[in-house]
Amino acid sequence: MAEPRLLSSGIVDARFGENVRVVQPVNLYGCTIGDDSFVGPFVEIQRNVVIGKRCKIQSHAFVCELVTIGDDCVISHGAMFIIDPFANGGPARGDRRLWRPTRLGNHVSIGSNATILPVSICDHVVIGAGAVVTKDVTEPGVYAGNPARLLRRLAPTTEGERIL
């Protein structure tokens, strides 16, 4: 029986704003995390991810490359981002030309165990637990299901007001 090649995890080449709190163990590399944000244990955030100010990334979340998260967002336990849309009917198998970006606006809350495919989500959105977001979300509201659908619209808020 062969021995496995062991690779280290931890924090490598990550950039942090002021007052960022990280609970280890984590796997953060090549990412940027904004001021006053929190990263829970067992989180992986990959290179070139940008996370805004005052965000919470809860335990066991997976944030892959090409993801941008706005300010005042919550990524709940076990949420997962996917950049491979299986455009050719199967996985990209590392072919980065097939990967697509994901963008979350400000004041977005992603529920536990939700899966976010390559989409854009506008400001002031709540994605329910276990939802699968397959298409762009262009209207503030609460979305849930597989595929995620609008359950309820959210009224516009003034700048700086938190709806989450």
Where are the regions a protein language model picked out?
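Acidic, glycine-centered active-site loop in nucleotide-sugar glycosyltransferases
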Residues: E139, A144-P147
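Short coil/turn connectors at secondary-structure junctions
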Residues: G105, T138-E139
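Flexible, glycine/small-residue-enriched loop-and-beta-strand segment within the central core
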Residues: A2-R15, R21-I33, S37-I121, P147, ...
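C-terminal/domain-terminus segments
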Residues: H124-V133, V142
